[in-house]
Amino acid sequence: MTTTVAEYSDILYEVKGAVARVTINRPDKLNAFTPHTVKELTHAVWSAGADSEVGVVVLTGAGDRAFSAGGDVSVENEDTFVAGDDSFDKLMKELYRAFRECLKPVIARVDGYAIGGGHHMAYVTDFTIASDRSVFGQNGPRVASPAEGWLVSHLWTVVGMKRAKEIWMLCRRYTAQQALEWGLVNAVVPAAELDAEVARWCDELLALSPTVLKLIKKSFDDSTAHIREEQERFTILNQVNPGFFASGEQTEGSQAFMEKRKPDFAPWR
């Protein structure tokens, strides 16, 4: 069994046996990610996909407090969301494209909070295995952090339209057991058994025909490709509110979060 380790600053990447393990390594920030983090994640996923020694990819977060708390609110603004090649919007779309087009199974190993962008990653991967102490949910409307297009609408293919809207629009928190019942995760186990459960899933997948697995994964992806392609032709935020970042609404959301107070969004209704 060989082990390969690649050097990154915000993530850890290790290939051991036929499993590539990608770890968001910002535990002091609950594994919240910056645009740079997303770039590294994307590079790692593509690397795993191109590696003939890799059969399964496992995505996780460092520590036992969070899989990922989503985008780092302290660096989120108009420039980081919509400006140029380093925008959150563009970079996240590239990451989810990597998850889809890496035709090897991608498993999200969730231990702790999977919130906001961390929740996105948990439900767009092929499988999600969670510890029983994990918590799932969205955060965008609560902190005025915009998300749009396929990233949002894909959730209805996982849990159904009504529940997807509830998750996205109400920002409630859901236990691992609730997530299992709704189809957000595939399995829930005690935290002490999480690595063994993930390893079991990896072993099962590695025993199967890699080409047939690729065909199945691409078939699922192609079934919704027309929706994704249509939504990626334009920016929905610019249609709904082209002056969103200049309006002060996003600033109020992020400042309220940093100040640990309830935001006042009344002026923007």
Positions of predicted regions on the chain:
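CoA-thioester-processing core
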Residues: 95-101, 109, 115-169, 182, ...
